[in-house]
């Protein structure tokens, strides 16, 4: 009943339940239907009475009363007159709130064009009329006439006439023979007279006939807009306005300031200009003013309306009194301060507070300390309610007084209220979901919030003055979600990689590490202890120390839960830690019977979580934290200057390196090496010296020393302890303190040749200090840029992935990805086990030896399976992936696999897209901003030899080797690899060996660890012959294409190929070497081509004409330096480049087909390369390659699809087009992982896959069939599949398309939801497009729902949606049943009523 009474007083309709929102162009009738009256005067309020002027911009008669239930003149007051319209002032008596809802309108004396449809590119009006924007503007702004009806004259339709031409035409043909108009009326006429169906049909015919690409594109664009208008029911002439709507006055308020001035919204100024000009125009028309004056006024009106809708889009920006541009309606929506991002996506909330945080080591993991004052303020409503319930107060006023006086009973009640009521803590910047967590508050004195030390990692908080915000979840549902989902105890694992995030750090690690150290010759060595009691006794009496080697008995339980014990060699410190381990058969003592570095502690917590569950883990973490702090305090580890050790050999190493650099300097002066080579060698030498000194220093720090007096082991070096345990500091920092600072970089990124030889302990010289300032300043500038860039990357990622939600359990996909271990420089960086853990197997995984099934198809791969897989040495596994998931909207749980933050299969409704975006974006701030500029050597080859990293047997993949005249094995293949297999035949290491390397091993040899496998010259790239014969030169003309340079010091001459194209005489030359037999015939290569080797500029000739060469001999060398120093984009810019799918600057050229390489006729400054396919049905493919680029293919080489013709970073689009989706996915995943791996950041592959899935959602139509699309359209992949299914059923022709890769920004703007796209970027463009097409937003994603103010369709909201769907389906069934049983209409009506009520 109550609700009904309240509804009487509520002027709004009940909150409608709706499923979608549509946007379209407003027709004049529509605008009038919204309006409550016309605004005729520009006045706002009367400056004396402060009452709104009648018919003005704030008119109470049109917009509603100023005070609740009171008319303007004060005749009718209070509720009883509700709904009456006062006869004196014409104001309706109602709530003043209607001034936020009621709109007005302005009738324009002349039509004006809507600037969005005119100027937002591509101009919709322009495309529709097939005129250029310039021409339309000439007509609109009264410069030219346009012919609308040519009649029988020689004029053409849409022809523009200047004033003079118009006069001449009138004289020539007479005024009534043709119609030419000017201004918006002209455009209105043209648009109103368009027959869209006919135009669409004509365009389709033209499209079918045209052959030129450009024309086709133009026609397609026009056809698209015409079809949009036809489908949406919009009329073209609505893009010209005759009526301007006026938004409600409370959305553009006029606020009195003190001192009698007013602050007003800019919109009021803009509306005033429109009204003034409109009224003036009306008056001029009534007065029959001269045409030129009226025209000028019309133009000014058009400009005023333009400024109102989008100020600054055309012409000068209209500024206010203080020279600041006025904010137009468009600006209200745009950007960070616009309606979408400021008020709809993020709002300020009440019941929140913020304060400084301090550490709370005595808290439990699920608690936080809340200052009493703060809690009192935050929980006020709850306290009032409780005071009332307990009878301490009868009114709110009384309760308020009690609370203000802070009476003792208030504190008791506060305690009750707070008990079991979680609060949310948030630290800005909230980069991932662990930046907001729920805690149970405990009341504390003081004014700072206490935070548990273990959650600092998740919040990225420290206690140097950080602040945190507290929010109170009010409703029961909110409290429930906070407790079940957001409690800190429920967030033990990191969503990005599944490793524990509640891990001790800094002091705690140091304490635990100290506790676990073993020392030699301590008192009591070799004693045996039966239990902890004895041990404690011995420790207290100093019979043993924490580090003594002892034997101790560790008690745990077996699988049945019966106590068992076992004796271990350990130390008292480790026994103390072992005492805290949960008693479980799967948690052995060995897990903490080792040096507890941060990594090992993390592994231990992970192990406990996997085997003992969440509750045990939380208790264990709390205990281990207490233990760590206690022993860090007891140990008292600190360091002074003497703890930084400078190695004795430093001076010697520095002297040796200086001698080397002097030698290089000499070689350069003698002309033996170039400037670049000298630079590379010097930088290399100093780099090696720094490393050597660091090694020596670390060896000194690690060394175990004994005290000569007591004979006991000396205390370990504390700097080393801190670094080695992972508590603080790194080898790099220790090197700078005690070794040598080493090489520094210039601001441009190049390395300065002179290093800093001193360290901080010795102190820097003035010059050294100056050199080091570059880096320091650049570091600061980088950090500032990085934060903004990283935040923007996260925002784009969230936007593209926000609608990837787990929406079903299994999509039944039969395709997936192949996972293999990632190998980098022979080292396995990511093992196959790490990569497949927590993913669903696509095919059964079989044991390679026994053939038994390890994991069945469709089961998730767990830790225990990974152990078996790793032992069995399986090298590739097919798994399900979000990329290949076939779910219509969202992703299915099977394809996604494990929810990393819980360690269980993912739940339905989990917003995996947002989690992926946060996991990738959050570490963004740790990535570097810099582009590496590396010298030739440093980038091309890091070393000049390869050593075996494992023992085993050698196998050569793609073996292609020959023995040269020195009897060495030489690699002739371009993609050959050396594999090292262990005894079981499992690949332990894979090394790529480059063309021209010398091999020291062959197939089947056994190698020891550290044995040399191959070596090569790092500074040159060889050109070798494959056949034995005699050398002959072609086109190597002295002075033109070859020059001899003599070395002054040695007198040795070398012949170098010079740029022959620089002289006119040499333009046709093709410098090459050919190998002939004795008879002088050119020899053939194994692949069929001639033995002719083309030489590029700067090649150094290694043989003389007529020399006899054997296969594998080098005939020329190309200095690596000429493979100009490349910039390697690294860090954040590289990640952004990959996600935006940009083409890299010097991108690789990839072969599109298998075939043979042939050299075609050269182009001006490009080489033409043709690939002749092995298969005759395919056309040959041509590539043009810039001539000076280093290029390693020879005529006649056989090339495979996907091989690189020109090295560089490949463009992702090429990979997609040539090798397909799977290759693209693995390329993007590996490249992005590479960047993060360098920084030591772990991110699970599936997150990157989810984002790549969102980038691959569109296909480009190639064959339209009967789909109604136009070739070149971008359509959702799933949408096309649905349409095709329907067409096949109807027996029509389906369409087909190729997948397209869109960058994340593009993909976000192309989401089906226009609300989401508009709130992302380019708001006006998105809304214009959506309005023309009459787009429908079905509110599928998260952002749209947040904006319209509903629960998001993920998590708990996802469940509600599902239940609602089931309920509606049931209701329909019931209605159908009833309809069948009772034919009576009344029953049906009643039922419909019932159902509606139920739905509400």
From Swiss-Prot:
Mg(2+) binds at residues 462, 464, 466. GO terms for biological process: DNA-templated transcription. One of its GO terms (cellular component) is DNA-directed RNA polymerase complex. Pfam families: RNA_pol_Rpb1_1 (PF04997), RNA_pol_Rpb1_2 (PF00623), RNA_pol_Rpb1_3 (PF04983), RNA_pol_Rpb1_4 (PF05000), RNA_pol_Rpb1_5 (PF04998). It is an enzyme of class 2 (transferase). Its cofactor is Mg(2+); Zn(2+). The keyword Nucleotidyltransferase applies. Keywords: DNA-directed RNA polymerase, Magnesium, Metal-binding, Nucleotidyltransferase, Transcription, Transferase, Zinc. Binds 1 Mg(2+) ion per subunit. GO terms for molecular function: DNA binding; DNA-directed RNA polymerase activity; magnesium ion binding; zinc ion binding. It catalyses: RNA(n) + a ribonucleoside 5'-triphosphate = RNA(n+1) + diphosphate. Zn(2+) 2 binds at residues 811, 885, 892, 895. Its EC number is 2.7.7.6. Zn(2+) 1 binds at residues 71, 73, 86, 89. Signal peptide: none annotated. It comes from the Bacteria. CDD domains: RNAP_beta'_C, RNAP_beta'_N. Belongs to the RNA polymerase beta' chain family. DNA-dependent RNA polymerase catalyzes the transcription of DNA into RNA using the four ribonucleoside triphosphates as substrates. HAMAP family: RNApol_bact_RpoC. The RNAP catalytic core consists of 2 alpha, 1 beta, 1 beta' and 1 omega subunit. When a sigma factor is associated with the core the holoenzyme is formed, which can initiate transcription. This is DNA-directed RNA polymerase subunit beta'.
């Amino acid at each position: 009943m109550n609700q009904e009474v309240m509804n009487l007083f509520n002027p709004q309709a009940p909150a409608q339940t709706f499923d979608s929102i549509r946007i379209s162009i407003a027709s004049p009738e529509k605008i009038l239907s919204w309006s409550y009256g016309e605004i005729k005067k520009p006045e706002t309020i009367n400056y004396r009475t402060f009452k709104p002027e009648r018919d003005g911009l704030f008119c109470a008669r049109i917009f509603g009363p100023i005070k609740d239930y009171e008319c303007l003149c004060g005749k009718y007051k209070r509720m009883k007159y509700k709904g009456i319209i006062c006869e004196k002032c014409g104001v309706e008596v109602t709530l003043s709130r209607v001034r936020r809802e009621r709109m007005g309108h302005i009738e324009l004396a002349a039509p004006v064009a809507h600037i969005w449809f005119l100027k937002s590119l591509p101009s919709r009006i322009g495309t529709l009329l097939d005129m250029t924007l310039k021409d339309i503007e000439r007509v609109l702004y009264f410069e030219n006439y346009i012919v609308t009806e040519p009649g029988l004259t020689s004029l053409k339709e849409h022809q523009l006439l200047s004033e003079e031409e118009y006069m001449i035409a009138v004289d020539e043909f007479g005024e009534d023979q043709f119609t030419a108009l000017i201004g918006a009326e002209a455009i209105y006429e043209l648009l109103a007279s368009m027959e869209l169906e006919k135009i669409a049909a004509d365009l389709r015919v033209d499209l079918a006939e045209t052959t030129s690409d450009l024309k086709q594109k133009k026609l397609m664009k026009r056809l698209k807009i015409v079809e949009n208008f036809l489908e949406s029911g919009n009329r073209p002439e609505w893009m010209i306005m005759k009526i301007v709507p006026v938004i409600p006055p409370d959305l553009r308020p006029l606020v009195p300031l003190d001192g009698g001035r007013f602050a007003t919204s800019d919109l009021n100024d803009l509306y005033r200009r429109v009204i003034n000009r409109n009224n003036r125009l009306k008056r001029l028309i009534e007065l029959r003013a001269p045409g030129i004056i009226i025209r000028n006024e019309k133009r000014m009106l058009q400009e005023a309306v333009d400024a109102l809708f989008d100020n600054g889009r055309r012409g000068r920006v209209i500024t206010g009194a203080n020279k600041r541009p006025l904010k137009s309606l468009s600006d209200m929506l745009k950007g960070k301060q616009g309606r979408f991002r400021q008020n709809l996506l993020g709002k300020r909330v009440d019941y929140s507070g913020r304060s400084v945080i301090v550490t709370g080591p005595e808290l439990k993991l699920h608690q936080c300390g809340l200052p009493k004052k703060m809690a009192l303020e935050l929980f006020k409503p709850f306290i009032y309610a409780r005071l009332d319930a307990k009878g301490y107060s009868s009114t709110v006023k009384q309760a308020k007084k009690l609370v203000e006086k802070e009476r003792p009973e208030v504190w008791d009640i506060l305690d009750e209220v707070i008990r079991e009521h979680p609060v949310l803590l948030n630290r800005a910047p909230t980069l991932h979901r662990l930046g907001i967590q729920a805690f149970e508050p405990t009341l504390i004195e003081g004014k700072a919030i206490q935070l548990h030390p273990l959650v600092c990692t998740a919040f990225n908080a420290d206690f140097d003055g950080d602040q945190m915000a507290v929010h109170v979840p009010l409703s029961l549902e909110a409290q429930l979600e906070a407790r079940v989902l957001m409690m800190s105890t429920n967030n033990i694992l990191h969503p990005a990689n599944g490793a524990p995030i509640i891990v001790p750090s800094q002091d705690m690690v140091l304490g635990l590490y100290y506790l676990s150290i073993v020392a030699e010759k301590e008192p009591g060595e070799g004693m045996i202890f039966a239990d902890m009691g004895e041990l404690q006794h011995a420790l207290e009496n100093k019979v043993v120390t924490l580090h003594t080697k002892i034997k101790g008995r560790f008690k745990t339980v077996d699988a049945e839960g019966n106590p068992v014990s076992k004796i271990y060699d350990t130390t008292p410190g480790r026994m103390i830690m072992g005492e805290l381990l949960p008693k479980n058969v799967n948690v052995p003592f060995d897990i903490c019977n080792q040096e507890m570095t941060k990594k090992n502690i993390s592994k231990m917590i992970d192990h406990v979580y996997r085997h003992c569950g969440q509750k045990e883990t939380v208790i264990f973490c709390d205990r281990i934290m207490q233990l760590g702090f206690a022993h860090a305090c007891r140990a008292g580890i600190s360091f002074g200057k003497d703890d930084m050790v400078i190695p004795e050999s430093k001076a010697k190493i520095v002297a040796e390196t200086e001698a080397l650099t002097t030698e290089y300097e000499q070689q350069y002066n003698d002309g033996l090496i170039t400037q670049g080579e000298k630079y590379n060698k010097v930088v290399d030498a100093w780099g090696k010296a720094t490393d050597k000194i660091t090694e020596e220093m670390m060896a000194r720090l690690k060394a175990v020393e004994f005290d000569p007096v007591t004979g006991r082991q000396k205390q370990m070096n504390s700097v080393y302890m801190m670094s080695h345990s992972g508590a603080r500091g790194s080898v790099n920092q220790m090197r700078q303190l005690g070794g040598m600072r080493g090489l520094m970089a210039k601001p441009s990124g190049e390395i300065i040749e002179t290093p800093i030889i001193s360290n901080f302990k010795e102190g820097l010289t003035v010059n050294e200090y100056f050199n080091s300032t570059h880096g320091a300043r650049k570091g600061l500038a980088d950090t500032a840029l990085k934060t903004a860039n990283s935040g923007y990357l996260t925002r784009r990622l969230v936007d593209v992935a926000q609608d990837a939600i787990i929406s079903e359990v299994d999509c039944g996909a039969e395709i997936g990805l192949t996972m293999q271990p990632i190998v980098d420089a022979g080292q396995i960086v990511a093992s196959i086990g790490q990569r497949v853990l927590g993913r669903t197997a696509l095919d059964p995984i079989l044991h390679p030896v026994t053939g038994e099934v390890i994991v069945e198809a469709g089961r998730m791969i767990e830790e225990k399976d990974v152990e078996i897989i790793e032992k069995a040495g399986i090298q590739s596994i097919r798994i399900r992936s979000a990329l290949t998931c076939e779910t219509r909207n969202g992703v299915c749980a099977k394809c996604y696999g494990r929810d990393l933050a819980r360690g269980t299969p993912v739940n339905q409704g989990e917003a995996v897209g947002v989690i992926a975006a946060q996991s990738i974006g959050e570490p963004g701030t740790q990535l570097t901003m810099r582009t590496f500029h590396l010298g030739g050597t440093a980038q091309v080859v890091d070393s000049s030899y390869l050593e075996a990293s494992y023992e085993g047997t050698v196998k050569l993949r793609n073996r292609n080797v020959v023995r040269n005249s020195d009897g060495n094995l030489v690699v002739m293949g371009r993609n050959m690899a050396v594999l090292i297999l262990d005894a079981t035949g499992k690949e332990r290491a894979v090394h790529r060996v480059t063309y021209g390397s010398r091999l020291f091993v062959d197939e089947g040899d056994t190698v020891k660890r550290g044995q040399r496998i191959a070596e090569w010259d790092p500074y040159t790239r060889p050109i070798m012959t494959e056949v034995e014969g005699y050398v002959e030169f072609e086109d190597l003309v002295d002075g033109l294409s070859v020059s001899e340079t003599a070395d002054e010091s040695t007198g040795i001459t070398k012949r170098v190929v010079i740029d022959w194209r620089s002289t006119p005489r040499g333009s046709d030359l093709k410098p090459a070497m050919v190998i002939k037999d004795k008879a002088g015939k050119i020899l053939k290569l194994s692949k069929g081509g001639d033995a002719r080797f083309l030489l590029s500029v700067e090649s150094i000739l290694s043989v003389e004409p007529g020399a006899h060469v054997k296969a594998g001999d080098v005939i020329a060398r190309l200095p690596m330096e000429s493979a100009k120093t490349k910039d390697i984009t690294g860090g954040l810019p590289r990640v952004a480049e990959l996600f935006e799918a940009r083409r890299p600057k010097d991108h690789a050229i990839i072969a599109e087909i298998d075939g043979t390489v042939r050299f075609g006729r050269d182009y001006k400054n490009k080489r033409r390369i043709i690939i002749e396919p092995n298969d005759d049905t395919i056309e040959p493919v041509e590539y043009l390659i810039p001539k000076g680029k280093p290029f390693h293919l020879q005529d006649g080489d056989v090339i495979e699809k996907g091989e690189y013709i020109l090295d560089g970073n490949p463009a992702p689009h090429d990979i997609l087009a040539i090798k397909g989706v799977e290759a693209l996915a693995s390329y993007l995943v590996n490249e992005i992982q590479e960047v993060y791996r360098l920084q030591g950041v772990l991110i699970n592959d599936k997150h990157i896959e989810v984002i790549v899935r969102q980038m691959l959602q569109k296909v480009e139509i190639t064959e339209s069939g009967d789909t109604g699309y136009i070739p070149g359209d971008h359509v959702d992949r799933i949408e096309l599949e649905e349409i095709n299914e329907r067409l096949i059923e109807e027996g029509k022709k389906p369409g087909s398309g190729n997948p397209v890769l869109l960058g994340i920004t593009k993909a976000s703007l192309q989401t089906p939801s226009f609300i989401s796209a508009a709130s992302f970027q380019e708001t006006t463009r998105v809304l214009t497009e959506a309005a023309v097409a009459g787009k429908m937003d079905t509110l599928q994603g998260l952002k749209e729902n947040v904006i319209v103010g509903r629960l998001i369709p993920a998590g708990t909201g996802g469940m509600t949606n599902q239940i609602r769907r089931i309920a509606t389906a049931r209701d329909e069934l019931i209605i159908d049943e009833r309809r069948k049983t009772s034919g009576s209409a009344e029953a049906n009506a009643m039922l419909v009523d019932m159902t509606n009520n139920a739905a509400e």
